[in-house]
Amino acid sequence: MTSTPADALRELEARVRDLEATAERTGQNLDAALAPLRTQLETLRREHAAGLSRWDRVQLARTPGRPTALDYVDRLCSDWTELHGDRRFGDDPALIGGPARWQGRPVMLLLQQKGRDTKTKIKRRFGSANPEGYRKAIRLMDLADRFGLPVVSLIDTQGAYPGLEAEERGQGWAIAESIQRMVRLRVPAVCAVIGEGGSGGALAIGVGNRVLIQENAWYSVISPEGAASILWRDAAQAPLAAEALRVTAADLLDMGIVEEVVPEPPGGAHLDMDAAAEALGSVISRHLDDLSALTPDDLLAQRAARFRSLGAFEER
Protein backbone atom coordinates (compact mmCIF):
# COMPACT_ATOMS: atom_id res chain seq x y z
CA MET A 1 0.00 0.00 0.00
CA THR A 2 1.30 3.47 -0.92
CA SER A 3 2.10 5.72 2.03
CA THR A 4 0.46 9.16 1.96
CA PRO A 5 1.85 12.43 3.42
CA ALA A 6 -0.75 12.15 6.19
CA ASP A 7 0.52 8.64 7.01
CA ALA A 8 4.10 9.93 7.20
CA LEU A 9 2.99 12.73 9.50
CA ARG A 10 1.16 10.36 11.85
CA GLU A 11 4.13 7.98 11.89
CA LEU A 12 6.55 10.77 12.80
CA GLU A 13 4.19 12.09 15.49
CA ALA A 14 4.06 8.59 16.99
CA ARG A 15 7.87 8.34 17.00
CA VAL A 16 8.19 11.69 18.78
CA ARG A 17 5.55 10.70 21.36
CA ASP A 18 7.29 7.38 21.99
CA LEU A 19 10.67 9.05 22.53
CA GLU A 20 9.15 11.68 24.82
CA ALA A 21 7.43 8.95 26.84
CA THR A 22 10.68 6.98 27.08
CA ALA A 23 12.57 10.06 28.26
CA GLU A 24 9.96 10.76 30.92
CA ARG A 25 9.76 7.13 32.06
CA THR A 26 13.50 6.46 32.25
CA GLY A 27 14.83 9.90 33.07
CA GLN A 28 17.18 9.76 30.06
CA ASN A 29 18.13 12.94 28.23
CA LEU A 30 16.98 12.29 24.66
CA ASP A 31 17.03 15.92 23.49
CA ALA A 32 19.70 15.19 20.88
CA ALA A 33 17.50 12.53 19.28
CA LEU A 34 14.29 14.52 19.64
CA ALA A 35 15.49 17.87 18.26
CA PRO A 36 15.83 16.84 14.58
CA LEU A 37 12.61 14.84 14.73
CA ARG A 38 10.70 17.83 16.12
CA THR A 39 12.13 20.05 13.39
CA GLN A 40 11.12 17.52 10.75
CA LEU A 41 7.68 17.19 12.34
CA GLU A 42 7.07 20.94 12.24
CA THR A 43 8.09 21.02 8.56
CA LEU A 44 5.78 18.12 7.73
CA ARG A 45 2.89 19.77 9.57
CA ARG A 46 3.34 22.99 7.60
CA GLU A 47 3.50 21.09 4.31
CA HIS A 48 0.43 19.06 5.26
CA ALA A 49 -1.51 22.21 6.21
CA ALA A 50 -0.70 23.82 2.86
CA GLY A 51 -2.42 20.95 1.05
CA LEU A 52 -5.62 20.83 3.12
CA SER A 53 -8.95 21.12 1.31
CA ARG A 54 -11.80 23.25 2.62
CA TRP A 55 -13.49 20.16 4.03
CA ASP A 56 -10.23 19.17 5.73
CA ARG A 57 -10.24 22.57 7.46
CA VAL A 58 -13.83 22.02 8.63
CA GLN A 59 -12.82 18.68 10.10
CA LEU A 60 -9.80 20.27 11.77
CA ALA A 61 -12.06 22.89 13.37
CA ARG A 62 -14.02 20.00 14.91
CA THR A 63 -10.99 18.07 16.13
CA PRO A 64 -11.49 16.67 19.65
CA GLY A 65 -9.17 18.53 21.95
CA ARG A 66 -9.30 21.79 20.01
CA PRO A 67 -9.23 24.70 22.50
CA THR A 68 -12.64 25.89 23.62
CA ALA A 69 -13.53 29.44 24.60
CA LEU A 70 -12.90 28.68 28.27
CA ASP A 71 -9.49 27.21 27.46
CA TYR A 72 -8.53 30.61 26.09
CA VAL A 73 -10.10 32.42 29.04
CA ASP A 74 -8.07 30.26 31.43
CA ARG A 75 -4.85 31.26 29.66
CA LEU A 76 -5.54 34.90 28.80
CA CYS A 77 -7.88 36.33 31.42
CA SER A 78 -7.89 37.20 35.09
CA ASP A 79 -10.78 38.27 37.35
CA TRP A 80 -13.23 36.33 35.13
CA THR A 81 -16.71 36.32 36.64
CA GLU A 82 -19.47 34.44 34.84
CA LEU A 83 -22.90 36.08 34.96
CA HIS A 84 -25.98 33.89 34.61
CA GLY A 85 -29.51 34.18 33.29
CA ASP A 86 -31.50 36.28 30.84
CA ARG A 87 -33.92 37.61 33.53
CA ARG A 88 -36.83 36.14 31.55
CA PHE A 89 -36.64 32.37 31.31
CA GLY A 90 -33.37 30.92 32.56
CA ASP A 91 -29.67 30.43 32.00
CA ASP A 92 -27.98 28.88 28.98
CA PRO A 93 -24.66 27.03 29.39
CA ALA A 94 -24.01 27.12 25.62
CA LEU A 95 -23.53 30.90 25.53
CA ILE A 96 -21.80 32.29 28.59
CA GLY A 97 -20.19 35.57 29.51
CA GLY A 98 -19.23 38.15 32.06
CA PRO A 99 -16.60 40.72 32.95
CA ALA A 100 -12.90 39.84 32.96
CA ARG A 101 -9.47 41.29 32.36
CA TRP A 102 -8.17 40.33 28.93
CA GLN A 103 -4.39 40.43 29.29
CA GLY A 104 -4.95 43.07 31.97
CA ARG A 105 -7.61 45.08 30.10
CA PRO A 106 -11.18 45.18 31.53
CA VAL A 107 -13.62 43.69 28.99
CA MET A 108 -17.00 42.01 28.74
CA LEU A 109 -16.71 38.46 27.38
CA LEU A 110 -19.31 36.67 25.24
CA LEU A 111 -18.36 33.02 24.77
CA GLN A 112 -19.88 30.12 22.87
CA GLN A 113 -18.72 27.11 24.85
CA LYS A 114 -19.00 23.61 23.37
CA GLY A 115 -17.71 21.66 26.34
CA ARG A 116 -14.52 19.75 27.01
CA ASP A 117 -15.79 16.18 27.39
CA THR A 118 -18.89 14.17 26.55
CA LYS A 119 -20.79 15.18 29.68
CA THR A 120 -20.18 18.92 29.32
CA LYS A 121 -20.70 18.84 25.55
CA ILE A 122 -24.18 17.39 26.09
CA LYS A 123 -24.89 19.89 28.87
CA ARG A 124 -23.82 22.78 26.63
CA ARG A 125 -25.49 21.31 23.52
CA PHE A 126 -22.16 21.48 21.66
CA GLY A 127 -22.26 25.28 21.76
CA SER A 128 -25.72 25.66 20.19
CA ALA A 129 -27.51 28.34 22.18
CA ASN A 130 -31.18 28.64 23.10
CA PRO A 131 -33.00 32.01 23.01
CA GLU A 132 -32.12 32.63 26.66
CA GLY A 133 -28.45 32.47 25.69
CA TYR A 134 -28.84 35.28 23.18
CA ARG A 135 -30.99 37.30 25.58
CA LYS A 136 -28.29 36.86 28.21
CA ALA A 137 -25.79 38.18 25.68
CA ILE A 138 -28.01 41.24 25.17
CA ARG A 139 -28.07 41.80 28.94
CA LEU A 140 -24.28 41.61 29.07
CA MET A 141 -23.95 44.03 26.16
CA ASP A 142 -26.20 46.47 28.05
CA LEU A 143 -23.81 46.20 31.01
CA ALA A 144 -20.80 46.67 28.74
CA ASP A 145 -22.25 49.92 27.42
CA ARG A 146 -23.19 51.11 30.90
CA PHE A 147 -19.70 50.55 32.32
CA GLY A 148 -17.67 51.33 29.19
CA LEU A 149 -16.28 47.81 28.79
CA PRO A 150 -15.07 46.68 25.35
CA VAL A 151 -16.79 43.50 24.17
CA VAL A 152 -14.74 40.46 23.18
CA SER A 153 -16.70 37.55 21.70
CA LEU A 154 -15.30 34.10 20.94
CA ILE A 155 -17.46 32.29 18.38
CA ASP A 156 -17.63 28.49 18.19
CA THR A 157 -20.94 26.99 17.13
CA GLN A 158 -22.47 25.08 14.24
CA GLY A 159 -25.55 27.23 14.71
CA ALA A 160 -28.31 28.13 17.14
CA TYR A 161 -30.12 25.20 18.78
CA PRO A 162 -32.84 23.96 16.35
CA GLY A 163 -35.13 22.29 18.90
CA LEU A 164 -38.89 22.81 19.17
CA GLU A 165 -38.57 24.43 22.61
CA ALA A 166 -36.11 26.98 21.26
CA GLU A 167 -38.48 27.93 18.45
CA GLU A 168 -41.40 28.19 20.89
CA ARG A 169 -39.38 30.62 23.01
CA GLY A 170 -38.56 32.84 20.02
CA GLN A 171 -35.20 31.69 18.69
CA GLY A 172 -35.24 33.81 15.53
CA TRP A 173 -36.39 36.90 17.40
CA ALA A 174 -33.70 36.50 20.05
CA ILE A 175 -30.97 36.21 17.40
CA ALA A 176 -32.28 39.30 15.60
CA GLU A 177 -32.39 41.28 18.84
CA SER A 178 -28.83 40.24 19.68
CA ILE A 179 -27.58 41.36 16.26
CA GLN A 180 -29.42 44.67 16.64
CA ARG A 181 -28.01 45.25 20.12
CA MET A 182 -24.46 44.54 19.03
CA VAL A 183 -24.74 46.93 16.09
CA ARG A 184 -25.67 49.68 18.56
CA LEU A 185 -22.81 49.13 21.02
CA ARG A 186 -21.03 52.35 21.93
CA VAL A 187 -17.91 50.49 23.03
CA PRO A 188 -15.32 48.62 20.92
CA ALA A 189 -16.31 45.09 19.89
CA VAL A 190 -13.82 42.50 18.65
CA CYS A 191 -15.11 39.08 17.55
CA ALA A 192 -13.02 36.00 16.84
CA VAL A 193 -14.14 32.70 15.29
CA ILE A 194 -12.11 30.08 17.16
CA GLY A 195 -13.63 26.91 15.70
CA GLU A 196 -16.96 26.76 13.93
CA GLY A 197 -19.00 29.77 12.89
CA GLY A 198 -22.36 28.58 11.62
CA SER A 199 -25.29 30.70 10.50
CA GLY A 200 -27.19 33.25 12.59
CA GLY A 201 -26.17 31.47 15.75
CA ALA A 202 -22.64 32.73 15.17
CA LEU A 203 -23.59 36.11 13.70
CA ALA A 204 -25.67 36.93 16.79
CA ILE A 205 -22.45 37.70 18.68
CA GLY A 206 -20.34 38.42 15.60
CA VAL A 207 -21.25 42.02 14.73
CA GLY A 208 -17.97 43.58 15.80
CA ASN A 209 -15.84 46.51 14.71
CA ARG A 210 -13.26 43.86 13.91
CA VAL A 211 -13.94 40.22 13.04
CA LEU A 212 -11.04 37.79 13.24
CA ILE A 213 -10.73 34.07 12.55
CA GLN A 214 -8.23 31.43 13.51
CA GLU A 215 -6.34 29.73 10.71
CA ASN A 216 -8.24 26.44 10.85
CA ALA A 217 -11.68 27.77 11.78
CA TRP A 218 -14.62 28.17 9.40
CA TYR A 219 -17.47 30.69 9.11
CA SER A 220 -20.51 30.49 6.84
CA VAL A 221 -24.23 31.14 6.49
CA ILE A 222 -24.83 27.42 6.99
CA SER A 223 -22.84 24.32 7.85
CA PRO A 224 -21.56 22.28 4.88
CA GLU A 225 -23.82 19.37 5.92
CA GLY A 226 -26.83 21.69 6.06
CA ALA A 227 -26.11 23.13 2.64
CA ALA A 228 -25.58 19.66 1.17
CA SER A 229 -28.87 18.43 2.63
CA ILE A 230 -30.74 21.33 1.03
CA LEU A 231 -28.99 21.48 -2.34
CA TRP A 232 -28.28 17.80 -3.02
CA ARG A 233 -30.61 16.12 -0.53
CA ASP A 234 -27.53 14.31 0.76
CA ALA A 235 -25.41 15.37 3.75
CA ALA A 236 -22.61 13.17 2.40
CA GLN A 237 -22.02 15.89 -0.20
CA ALA A 238 -20.70 18.17 2.57
CA PRO A 239 -17.16 18.30 1.10
CA LEU A 240 -18.60 19.63 -2.16
CA ALA A 241 -20.72 22.15 -0.24
CA ALA A 242 -17.67 23.35 1.71
CA GLU A 243 -15.92 24.11 -1.58
CA ALA A 244 -18.94 26.00 -2.93
CA LEU A 245 -19.49 27.98 0.29
CA ARG A 246 -15.82 29.06 0.56
CA VAL A 247 -15.84 28.67 4.33
CA THR A 248 -12.14 28.83 5.25
CA ALA A 249 -10.17 31.61 6.89
CA ALA A 250 -8.26 32.33 3.67
CA ASP A 251 -11.54 32.57 1.72
CA LEU A 252 -13.06 34.94 4.26
CA LEU A 253 -10.01 37.19 4.29
CA ASP A 254 -10.03 37.27 0.49
CA MET A 255 -13.72 38.27 0.47
CA GLY A 256 -13.19 40.97 3.11
CA ILE A 257 -15.47 39.29 5.66
CA VAL A 258 -12.71 39.15 8.30
CA GLU A 259 -9.96 41.63 9.06
CA GLU A 260 -7.26 39.16 10.01
CA VAL A 261 -6.44 35.46 10.18
CA VAL A 262 -4.89 34.45 13.50
CA PRO A 263 -2.12 31.89 12.88
CA GLU A 264 -2.21 28.55 14.68
CA PRO A 265 0.68 26.29 15.69
CA PRO A 266 1.72 23.82 12.95
CA GLY A 267 -0.88 21.07 12.78
CA GLY A 268 -3.60 23.02 14.57
CA ALA A 269 -4.41 24.80 17.82
CA HIS A 270 -5.10 21.49 19.61
CA LEU A 271 -1.41 20.55 19.39
CA ASP A 272 -0.19 23.58 21.37
CA MET A 273 -2.94 25.41 23.27
CA ASP A 274 -0.52 27.80 24.95
CA ALA A 275 0.94 28.99 21.64
CA ALA A 276 -2.53 29.26 20.10
CA ALA A 277 -3.72 31.31 23.08
CA GLU A 278 -0.70 33.59 22.92
CA ALA A 279 -1.33 34.33 19.24
CA LEU A 280 -5.06 34.91 19.73
CA GLY A 281 -4.54 37.07 22.80
CA SER A 282 -1.99 39.36 21.19
CA VAL A 283 -4.04 39.87 18.00
CA ILE A 284 -7.24 40.71 19.90
CA SER A 285 -5.35 43.05 22.24
CA ARG A 286 -3.82 44.85 19.24
CA HIS A 287 -7.23 45.44 17.69
CA LEU A 288 -8.63 46.65 21.03
CA ASP A 289 -5.74 49.11 21.22
CA ASP A 290 -6.57 50.40 17.73
CA LEU A 291 -10.27 50.81 18.52
CA SER A 292 -9.70 52.52 21.87
CA ALA A 293 -8.82 55.74 20.04
CA LEU A 294 -12.31 55.99 18.47
CA THR A 295 -15.23 57.88 19.99
CA PRO A 296 -18.55 56.08 20.61
CA ASP A 297 -20.04 57.77 17.53
CA ASP A 298 -17.04 56.73 15.44
CA LEU A 299 -17.37 53.13 16.66
CA LEU A 300 -21.06 53.06 15.70
CA ALA A 301 -20.37 54.52 12.27
CA GLN A 302 -17.41 52.25 11.56
CA ARG A 303 -19.32 49.12 12.57
CA ALA A 304 -22.35 50.03 10.46
CA ALA A 305 -20.19 50.88 7.45
CA ARG A 306 -18.23 47.65 7.83
CA PHE A 307 -21.27 45.39 7.56
CA ARG A 308 -23.05 47.44 4.91
CA SER A 309 -20.00 47.11 2.67
CA LEU A 310 -19.95 43.30 2.76
CA GLY A 311 -20.90 41.36 -0.33
CA ALA A 312 -20.93 42.19 -4.01
CA PHE A 313 -23.39 42.34 -6.85
CA GLU A 314 -23.23 42.81 -10.58
CA GLU A 315 -25.57 45.02 -12.60
CA ARG A 316 -26.55 43.87 -16.07
Swiss-Prot record:
It comes from the Bacteria. Pathway: Lipid metabolism; malonyl-CoA biosynthesis; malonyl-CoA from acetyl-CoA: step 1/1. One of its GO terms (cellular component) is acetyl-CoA carboxylase complex. Its EC number is 2.1.3.15. The keyword Secreted does not apply. NCBIfam families: accA, AccA_sub, PRK05724.1. This is Acetyl-coenzyme A carboxylase carboxyl transferase subunit alpha. It comes from Deinococcus radiodurans (strain ATCC 13939 / DSM 20539 / JCM 16871 / CCUG 27074 / LMG 4051 / NBRC 15346 / NCIMB 9279 / VKM B-1422 / R1). The gene is accA.
